[in-house]
Amino acid sequence: CTILPSVAFPLELNHTPKARREERARYLLGPVGLGDVADRYPSQLSGGQQQRVAIARALANNPSIMLCDEATSALDSTTTAQILDLLRRINRELNVTLVIITHSLSVARNICDRVAMIDGGRIVEMGDTEQLFANPQSDILKTLIADAAIEDHRHHDDATETTATEKEQQA
């Protein structure tokens, strides 16, 4: 099926009249930036667009809470930033509480107000995001933050090396 009935499906489950389902689905595609692709098939969309369809479908029944399980895991950094911006707007403008499940510390730090660190099925640390990242108490979070800092440093070094090499080639 195309995107429009996919977004409307939760409304069908709630026995919403067909005309209202289509109207609501078309409306929801606008805020997620897909108003012009309602008649396309999911296979014709990029990964980021497919994620936006899933977000629109999740909003169909006006939830107060939305669970986002690895919402950016298969996306490039530009698309990840766009999806996080969209989720931030949903939280702020629609007053929807977001529960974000992610393995990415940068995603957690970027969008979450509070973080719960889970290790082996147990919460090992929980609190305000900035405080947790500034002063981690658990060994696992300390290690992950240190590893992320090393990785960030590597990316920075790679970018600097590439820039230096490009300048050498231009000379």
For the regions a protein language model found, what residue spans apply to each?
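Conserved ABC ATPase signature
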Residues: 41-45, 49
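ABC ATPase "signature
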Residues: 126-127
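C-terminal boundary and immediately downstream tail of ABC-type ATPase nucleotide-binding domains
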Residues: 134-171
